């Protein structure tokens, strides 16, 4: 289950979105759940329904993307996060506002810095680029952290941000 959504604009991480969702099933991996710090019973009473959460997510995207822009899903190991978001967008809204438009930060770093794949761990990237933030498994904080990594890679290789 997708239990929380965190997003931010990569060029303005203070412009962001966060919500927690009600679980859609009672099946879960205890180890994976323990990393999140969530309690499923609490989320059942406080989380948004998937329909509402995805609609709110789309509303936030629409409010932050101008008519001549397209939203791009940027993530660290983008295939993992995008697959959950794509499934929920399609199941609950019928379409994904990102479509298939995405950028994978790991792959971007791998290509720009010509490193071994083992060196694309976020901890190695943080060390090399002197990132100030870290990942803590909170969806919003992770999105802001990933935006920092994305911008540091661009600054290092292109001398500018997006």
List where the protein language model places each region:
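Conserved non-catalytic scaffold segment of RNase H-like nuclease domains
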Residues: 1-79
């Amino acid at each position: 289950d997708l239990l929380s959504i965190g997003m931010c604009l990569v060029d303005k991480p203070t412009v962001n979105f966060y919500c927690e969702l009600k679980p859609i099933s009672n099946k879960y991996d205890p180890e994976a759940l323990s990393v999140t710090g969530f309690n499923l019973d609490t989320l059942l009473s406080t989380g948004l329904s998937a329909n509402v959460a995805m609609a709110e997510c789309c509303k936030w995207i629409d409010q932050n993307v101008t008519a001549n822009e397209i939203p791009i899903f940027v993530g660290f190991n983008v295939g993992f996060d995008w697959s959950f978001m794509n499934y929920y967008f399609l199941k609950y809204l019928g379409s994904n506002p990102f479509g298939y438009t995405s950028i994978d930060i790991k792959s971007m770093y791998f290509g720009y810095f010509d490193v071994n794949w083992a060196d694309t761990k976020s901890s190695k990237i943080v060390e090399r680029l002197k990132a100030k933030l870290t990942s803590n498994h909170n969806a919003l904080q992770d999105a802001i952290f990933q935006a920092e990594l994305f911008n540091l890679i661009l600054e290092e290789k292109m001398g500018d941000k997006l």
